[in-house]
């Protein structure tokens, strides 16, 4: 997010009424800040989740809004990438019973399952990037909050979203398998995951817009997460007795292509495009931390956080911001500095991003974990300059965990990583709200407020600081680079997934509204629309001019499915309803028979579904 080729650049300050912590006097020690801000981040994510959050009016259950901001900039949409990274964070917390935060596993799993259901719908939504029929529509980066396509000009397609979504869902599917719920993993999760894996296998060698939605080329971040997704997808397919031919054949070729981004000094974030940029970019830091494998060695081929390439790249990236931000004045090399997307950035004035400064810390915590697990660290010609910032006399060589050099270096690097968190602490308002950016001169938060991705980034960074890491994704068996690169993508097959996740967690108190999804089978023609109305205000009180519209986003020639998600009916309310069609000339055609009757349920599940067939 979110300067695109189609949007003008403006400097817009966020005008919230906030109190700021002094950059020169910490309001609390780092440990206390981490504890409080971690809980604040959980709240921030929850508030931005549709079907639950207080800041998501009109948002479908399971969708994350990027931010509650509706203007300057307008981020009141759902992005596939941001959402996938956020739900992966929550799935990791779910697997460790909430990670010590004040959120229950029941609440986490409800959110996870609602997310899965929402993505099953979004995969089927035709959009400016294409349709599900040939998979092209899966590359659409953002959607309206009501599950409809965003039709405005944008940097599309973006090819990281399907890979990130697949990785998140595979993680949850693996949990289901390990907890005796293999049938749910196979019947509900796999069809959604398979679509995304097919997309990666088919389109990985096509150019697309980068994660900042600005340049059209080949992106390091995109290719890195695509490689991981196919490796994990192959493993899941084997567990479920499914087939993913593209997973095994294409993952090595993606890894082969990924080596093209290393220029000998740092990772060039984007290639195969005409640009004057240096290629130094947060893109590469995020690529390493989102393909971090706690069981991996310090492999250069996969750019693991402890690898010589990742460390050299980290130094080049951080150092590129030292002289361009006023708030970095006087900060020497080897000390944490505020960082942004890339040094040439001009969006909203080109400022530090909270998630960037947090990512700089997270990569170092990942590296520390890997060194401690391996029991040594290696200083090579490639990584020497990085290590010299912490010990000017260090020489190339291998240092065991028992050596004084190892202890000196790792202690200094941990302090360096903590320094990035301290900067976030210094520039976070006293209410804990994390915006997208903070001003390069004044440190005032700006751009979109309460950015979901910022909150998720805080949680993952501090989890890694505590050596709480996700499960291995199989890097050890997938780090061998083929001797010859061969681009031979596999044309995918795609399947519409119509059913919502039958959640067994999450309950609805009798005083709350309950989201209900109505599914209707009816054969219609182009221009004919379907509505429902009833004796409650949410359905228009029998007024056909104010009925509730159904959408045909899941409609196919073989499955004439219309659906509507109604969210404003109080739990326990009995009501009548009926479907009708509106012809192109405005004529209303009612279905036959008596009024249908339904009682909005209390208890579980939290998102009930009603399946109907048009009565002729």
Residue ranges and their predicted role:
Residues 1-24:
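Fungal secretory targeting signals
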Residues 22-35, 93-113, 172-194, 234-255, ...:
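Structural helix-adjacent loops and short alpha-helical linkers that scaffold large soluble proteins
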Residues 76-201, 223:
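Aromatic-rich carbohydrate-recognition surfaces in CAZymes
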